[in-house]
Amino acid sequence: MQDKIPTIAELRELSLRLLTKIPYLKMLVLFGSRATGNINANSDWDFAVLYDEEKYNLYIQNNPLAAFVIPGILGEIFKINSDKIDIVELNHCSKLIAHFVARDGKVLYEEPGDEFDKFQQRVLLSNTEIKKIEKTKLENIENFLQRWGV
């Protein structure tokens, strides 16, 4: 792997090579600290992927381990350590994670060209919705702790 950290522009250019190895990819987004610029020596690489479900399901039939090799493919093409890569599948993630990807993410690849705009329109939450989700999560944690006598 290289010592040089690739720029967003370099990642966008390199991402065009992904389709040969991930033919069901519709969108790739960098999010988290690398997208916001709040990085440190231990920062990982958070990527969100959106797949064409039909193509993905057909591909998985012949390549059952395909989902597990995505970090390796991204690491190889972007020349970054695959152990530092986290993948979120936007087809199956929580509303809150999808919101943060839509709010803070940097699109590296999308097909068709307005996929990220459509995604943002679908998943961006209002402050009221975020507070409601956070309240529900806190209540769930409190209930769990009470059941365990903590």
Curated annotation (Swiss-Prot):
Signal peptide: none annotated. Its EC number is 2.7.7.108. Its cofactor is Mg(2+). The active site is at residues 44, 46. The keyword Glycoprotein does not apply. Mn(2+) works as well as Mg(2+), Co(2+), Ni(2+) and Zn(2+) work less well. Bind 2 Mg(2+) per subunit. Mg(2+) 2 binds at residues 44, 46. CDD domains: NT_KNTase_like. A motif (GSX(10)DXD motif) lies at residues 32-46. One of its GO terms (molecular function) is nucleotidyltransferase activity. Changing residue 44 to A: No longer neutralizes HepT, no di-AMPylation of HepT. Keywords: ATP-binding, Magnesium, Metal-binding, Nucleotide-binding, Nucleotidyltransferase, Toxin-antitoxin system, Transferase, Virulence. The keyword Glycosyltransferase does not apply. Mg(2+) 1 binds at residues 44, 46, 86. It catalyses: L-tyrosyl-[protein] + ATP = O-(5'-adenylyl)-L-tyrosyl-[protein] + diphosphate; O-(5'-adenylyl)-L-tyrosyl-[protein] + ATP = O-[5'-(adenylyl-(5'->3')-adenylyl)]-L-tyrosyl-[protein] + diphosphate. NCBIfam families: MntA_antitoxin (NF047752). Belongs to the MntA antitoxin family. Forms a complex with HepT, probably MntA(1):HepT(2) in vivo; can only be purified when both 'Arg-102' and 'Tyr-109' (or 'His-107' and 'Tyr-109') of HepThave been mutated. The fully di-AMPylated HepT homodimer is not found in a complex with MntA. Part of a locus that includes subtype I-D CRISPR-Cas genes. This is Protein adenylyltransferase MntA. It comes from Aphanizomenon flos-aquae (strain 2012/KM1/D3).
